Structures are given as structure tokens and as C-alpha cells.
């Protein structure tokens, strides 16, 4: 590498190190919430056709754990998900008023269509309408934070990490 290339790389690194994503202010957050709730998220007037019976909530919990738990945690709070708060935007707590203020049809619409450009994928064509509605029922009846443990994929990773640290301590 020649001197000018090194200078450009160092200059770009210096400039970019000053760039960071700042949290939106209260006014920006409130405006974004209003836009999401009133304009961009469909299904506002669509009622949930699946009754919130214990059986349907349990079915919703199973579908949620299988499809949604890797990002939202098994409890909808991100419990045990190592990157939940590192995403931009962070993965929301599904028990938060921001999420719970959505109508059932809006929650189903989000599950079905996803939210771009966030990491929320579309489940259209993967989950049936009935499965999505059951997930909505589960989201309406979330268990206490941490009560369901952490997703198996992260539990295995955590156990491996702890196992490695135990061996490191033993070898010292």
C-alpha cells in the first residue's frame, strides 16, 4: 500500500468513528409510533376469528416459540436473546404498551407482512392464518418475563460457553 492509500484509510476510519446512531428523541418516537399505528400497519378493523381459549393460547405459544422465540424470546420479552437490544431498532418487548395498543388485526398484519426495514420477517406463506391468529392470542396473554426460560438454541450456546470457561479455570 502506498502512503496516500494509508492516509485515506486512516482518514475514513477517523471520520466514520464519529458516526453513530443516536436514539430518537421523545417527539420522534411518538410520531413514528403514531404513523405505524394509524397509517402503515393494516388490519385495524379486522377482528380475531380465533377465540382466546386456553387451548388456542397454548397452540399460539407453541407456534410463537418455534417461529418467533429466536428473536423475541419464549416470553415475548427477548429473554435469553443475546442480540435483542443490539438491533436497530431494538426488538420490542411484546408486553409493552406500544405493542399491546395495536388491534388484533394489526398484530396479525405485522406477523403476516413483517416490518421493513426492521428485522421482523413476513410469515405469509409459512404460517397459516389460523396459526397467526393463535400467535396473536398468545401475545395478548404473555407469561411473566423470564418464566419460560431461554430459546434452546441460545441455551445450548450458553452451556457450551460455560463449559469452556470451566475448562479454562481447571487448566489454570
Could you tell me what each predicted segment is?
Residues 1-7:
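Bacterial N-terminal signal peptides that target proteins for export
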Residues 20-22:
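Bacterial signal peptide processing site
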Residues 15-18:
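C-terminal motif of bacterial Sec signal peptides marking the signal peptidase cleavage site
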Residues 42-43, 104, 122-172:
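Flexible coil segments in periplasmic/lumen-exposed cytochrome c-class electron-transfer proteins
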Residues 53-77, 84, 107-109:
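Sequence/structural segment immediately N-terminal to covalent heme-attachment motifs in c-type
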Residues 98-113:
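Short Fe-S-cluster ligation motifs
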Residues 72-78, 112-113, 125, 140:
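Detector for the c-type heme attachment site
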Residues 26, 30-63:
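Electrostatic cytochrome c docking/interface patches
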